[in-house]
Amino acid sequence: LPEYFDVVIVGAGLSGIGAACHLQRECPDRSYVILEGRADLGGTWDLFRYPGVRSDSDMHTLGYEFKPWAHEKSIADGPSILAYLREAAAENHVDAHIRYHHKVQGASWSSEDARWTVHADNTVNGAPVELTCSFLFMNAGYYSYQEPYAAELPGIDRFQGTVVHPQFWPDDLDYSGKRVVVIGSGATAMTIVPAMAAEAAHVTMLQRSPTYVVARPDRDKIANRLRQLLPDTLAYRITRRKNITLLGYFYGQTRSKPDKTRQLLLGAVRKQLGDEITDAHFTPSYNPWDQRLCLLPNGDLYEAIRSGRASVVTDHITTFTPSGIVLESDAELEADIVVTATGLQLVTPGEMRFDVDGVPVDFADTFTYRGLAFSDVPNMASTFGYINASWTMRSDLIARFVCRLLNHMRATGTDQCTPRLRESDRDMPRRPWIDGFTPGYMQRVMARMPSQGDRAPWLNPQRYKAEKNDLLKAPLDDGVLQFTRTNQRITV
């Protein structure tokens, strides 16, 4: 018989490790296993090895609510974040529950047994593995680890230099003294450009359109002062609350006063780079937070541009040549190395196949329940963080909600929990998975994602304060979550 666990957590990255820590703290008698397809924990922070890899938000909010970030830098480099995750896993004894080289391919739900059968492959020997569980908690991330987005780059096969994608950075790439073109304008490109500019002959960031940027120090003076005066846990709690409040206020201002926010953001860039560069390369056509803002720690990209070691070109590619790229303006960029920072390939939960009682699940046909579960899919939750704040702020909330749910089911003697549309919900209009967020990587996958409705709880909210109250305090018997015991309906 397949091995059984109360909970199977898929993914040992930032979300999965956090989920296991919460489960162990709040549901200590539940058996669980973490299935991880890679050879190590860390997810994004183990996968990405490109120069300068770092967080794009502060670690007092990207860190777990239960584990203080106790370093001088609040904008942290990738290795420091990976070390933090390892510490969290070891301190909470969840590392012993991880099974590496177990790539989950799908899962099948049986209402008769009230169990998921999880289908995985052992990536070392290729052997199929089956496990069963009562609850499936998906924390496998939101993008494909195997296939990044393949942007159309005409004639790239003609290029005789080196082409690198940030998702698969070679350890032995020597770019010292080389001419580098980084294609892209997102967080990855803006991280790589100043990092490579320190050694390369010159780095050009080639973008089709500009992105909003904001510079801030990589050290939080208030946080570091509090750490000198107070215990780490208290100092962290105060700093975290401060930063969450400021993030919420800033996001609210950008949405309610977009023109004013736009002028403030562009004004800050003008002070660093002047009008000509700002107007040509840092003035987006959309409003702030229609797409995610890019963070520049200590204004590192500004410094690289001012020094002449880096530059920005806003144009479209006509074709690659053996020695570079010809643009629509007829300009040509010569390059020894091209970095294609053109984006991630988003996927529905973990690129996996699911079925409920033999019927395949098409997530595009479902409605999202509070942004964490799916209509008519029992005993499953999936983590997707905030697009306007640190990912972990939401993954912590979702993990705590799942623990609440599991304890509620234990207390009521139920073993199945399924979000189902009420009669009054059946004519709801379908709205996109996330409202008002327009980057290409999101738009490319939106048609395959669950829909929002026009009323709670069929929403995917992006506001931490309101969602914290809902997920941690709102009644679970909300008329949507249907709790049953196998072969017997229970009214809760």
Question: Where are these predicted regions, by residue range?
Answer:
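Feature captures the FAD/FMN-dependent oxidoreductase FAD-binding
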Residues: 72-144, 272, 319
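Alpha/beta-hydrolase fold catalytic core
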Residues: 263, 267, 271-334
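Core beta-strand elements of the Rossmann-like FAD/NAD(P) dinucleotide-binding domain
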Residues: 3-5, 124-135, 175-176, 328-337
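Beta1-alpha1 glycine-rich phosphate/pyrophosphate-binding loop at the start
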Residues: 5, 9-10, 14-98, 207-208, ...
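Short FAD-binding loop at a beta-strand-to-alpha-helix junction that anchors the flavin cofactor
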Residues: 62-64, 162-163, 371-388
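Short beta-strand to alpha-helix junction loop
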Residues: 69-87, 99, 183, 253-261, ...
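Rossmann-like dinucleotide-binding core of oxidoreductases
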Residues: 2-4, 8-9, 14, 19, ...
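C-terminal active-site-capping segments
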Residues: 396, 400-492
